[in-house]
């Protein structure tokens, strides 16, 4: 008689009881499904019949319950169907039910143009999510101009969110073809409003969006013209060419007969003449559609690098693409103590000094031709002043004087100085007034003064106790609020002139000592300067008032401090294959490295030229 195997822990080579061998047969599920389908083919162990459209389908109750939550709920409940041998199904045809039953037993289904609609409806009703998703994927492949409108309606009716969104993207991207085929003319008002108001509407210029909206109204003017003002308000009128705005938009009867439409025309004209402060009065109409190639960009001018060399570089950053490009360099010596402001889509650099001589010169950057030109000088040479824009005019404010520049006349005029002289003041415009913040001359106490251009009068702002600033903070206006960014702290204070109230927002990611501040796209952008460890930084971070949070937006082409920054609108098409130097670029870091290389070469060339000139 053979002895049994000794499985005690003390046996040689036998593992302890704690040891185990987990086993998993990856093909088991497939073999099980195949076996169940074979039983179906052999008509064995059926325990019920489902019927639809006069066709009967013997099946296994367990298989249906395992494949569909609909059938699981039906068979597990207390309804008659839970124990019935035969169940009649409605709202589905026999052939479509046959496809779903085949899927239960095989995991396979063939979607065709003929069955996709009823199959998706049945999959939605009987809760087969993977079949429903397969139908959505098929419909997405079939999208074209002739069927996209119906597919979006169908997708939304059956809560196919992915298909609905991809179809909407297709429609927005092919709106011109839909208009050409007169498909847009049969849209409901709700749909037309949905497309016209979307930033992603793909038009080469805003004039095309106007024409499409007009085409829709004029296809049935009797029932649609009363909807025109509501549709009209979602057009980006400020970005329609001035001539076209006058000759074709304002002259259209639908527009000039509507007081509200004429009000929007005046708003667009004010924007185009730089009398409308887009940062102070945020509005969707002031945001160009990306497809037009026009973007609001951040422009960084001058500053100093890590060697404290003064820069004459001008870089621009597109937040839509995350890309940097360099613009025409400043044609003169920037020096220190200059001020920068954006008037419309032009940039003005005023004053400064070379350490021994003050400048009264004013340089204007014309963004449409990428060129710097000198305009009429200020009435007084100055440095460490402040400049800002209000009602289409450029204001320069210093401790002892205030002057104003009219770009249409290329002239300066002297205004009343501040009520109390302030050292190194910071200014911004908010709700049709100028606000200046700084320390009283020869004192440490901070005050805020306000200038009313209608009366040409300065006045003290009785705004209560000011925050404990060590230095005059940088200021910028956004949607009726003045933001004060400290130089020696990540804290940011907010003042509401309308309510005369103070508030705080979450602190910045890091400090930006000697950094720069600008408003762009409804956000605050802070860049460069020295960080918490007093290392020169290239960080660009932004604050979103809607989420009340800061986020890292990118990095400057090189670490910089004392630079100026503003935002303007400019054609800024994204680069994909070629970098600025014509060398293939895989990422933004390569772009920045190439910019720095070109800058370094240019700097060395100028340095060698100056050394040769000195000799």
From Swiss-Prot:
Coiled coil: none
Localization, UniProt: Cytoplasm, Cytoskeleton, Spindle
A single GO BP: protein ubiquitination
Domain of life: Eukaryota
Domain BACK as annotated: residue spans: 148-249
Segments forming domain BTB: 46-113
GO MF assignments: ubiquitin-like ligase-substrate adaptor activity
Pfam families noted in UniProt: BACK, BTB, Kelch_1, Kelch_6
PANTHER family listed in its UniProt record: KELCH-LIKE PROTEIN 32, LD33804P
The name this protein goes by in its record: Kelch-like protein 21
Organism whose genome encodes this protein: Xenopus laevis (African clawed frog)
